[in-house]
Amino acid sequence: MAAAPFVYCAPSDGGRTDENALLMAALHGNLGRLKDIVNSLTRGNGGPSAIFSFNKDGVDVLHGAACGGHLEVCKYLVEELGGDVNAPGIGSVALGATPFMMSAQSGDVPTVKYFLDHGGDLMKADDKGRTILHHAVSAGCCKVTEFLLSKGVPVDIDCGRGPPLFMAATNEQDKTLKILLDHHANPNIIISGATTPLLSALIYRSLKCMKLLIKAGADVNCKASTMTLLVFATMQGGYTNFIKFLLKAGADPNIPDDLGRLPIELAALRDCKEEVEMLLPLTTPIPTVPNWSIEGVISHVKNEDKKPMEQRHRERRQRLLKSQADTAFKLKEYKMASECYGLAIDHGESATLYANRSVCKLLLGDGEGSLSDALRCRMLRPDWAKACYRQAAAHMLLK
């Protein structure tokens, strides 16, 4: 599952500092404790509003109270201390999210309504292009999602990184996804010219989201995307149950990839008899395959695969996959990007591709995978500064 928009972990040193104690009091909704700390911190050091300068990775006291849905604490911070409900958190955790956005993830409608009544900006986006509706949807907060839509937030609002429906699919939030669809979200919307909510749901293995999207009219073949669902699933592997579902839903197994290969051929390349067996009766026989059977298809495809792919085809495919990976990376969908970089590597090793996949794995918390790619990158380009940097970053994560 993709990372939810905001997941805050309490400071590791707990209450050893007044700043941490302040944030912990806000997170836990302890108003009395919070007031005591505010008085202690600001005694002789300026006005109480100075407490908003204390933060942890961009998360200040109002962000913390908002995320916890602690309404009384929020009222105190806004009305008595002058907290700004639209102040973006500048840091690696907040990523530009405002207290108003974070309040959506509390699931507490009264807190969200309070922030809205005090100037909360429904259209403002954080550093990842997510509005408050994106935050509510990604966290699976159904009541908040309904409330925001009732206030006129466009159901397909997109600030450059995809609409809320895309976020629901990548976070496996079938309940909020259904709410969006009930409010007429477009199930066939194209994100950055490369993917759709249905393809995203497949990549993240969310069968519930896929069923809802298809029921709402999503194109089961994703013809407007760079590849069909069956092509992706049979090429990638590990999606056998999803292939069975897609075929029952009417997916066409006769649509090839950009090199003219059908899903049955891609499954045969991986020697997956179960998938070939499912696809065989629904696929139009290939004239060049003399024995149209499970073993016959696998044998033919394996023999054909021994022949060298034309260099221009290999390069074209690699460019396509890299483009898809780059798009996913810009959307901060690192799992999707990592998989696409891996497919591109299968078409020819490249230091750049290994470096890019290394940083994806780093951001996903996979230190060993990141280091492995960084080392491979250094083998291909020993003196490349980026390769050395990737290796050092992976080592830091593993410490």
Residue ranges of model-derived segments:
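Ankyrin-repeat-protein effector appendages
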Residues: 2-21, 151, 183, 216, ...
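Ankyrin repeat boundary/linker residues
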Residues: 15, 55, 89-93, 126, ...
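Start-of-repeat signature of ankyrin repeats
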Residues: 18, 58, 92, 96, ...
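Ankyrin-repeat alpha-helix packing hotspot
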Residues: 24, 64, 102, 135, ...
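Ankyrin-repeat intra-repeat helix-capping/turn positions
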Residues: 29, 69, 107, 140, ...
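Conserved ankyrin/ankyrin-like repeat signature
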Residues: 33, 72-73, 110-111, 143-144, ...
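Ankyrin repeat domain, specifically the short helix-to-loop turn at the C-terminus of the second helix
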Residues: 38-49, 75-84, 113-121, 146-154, ...
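Helix-start (N-cap) detector for alpha-helical repeat units in TPR-like alpha-solenoids
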Residues: 318, 351-352, 385-386
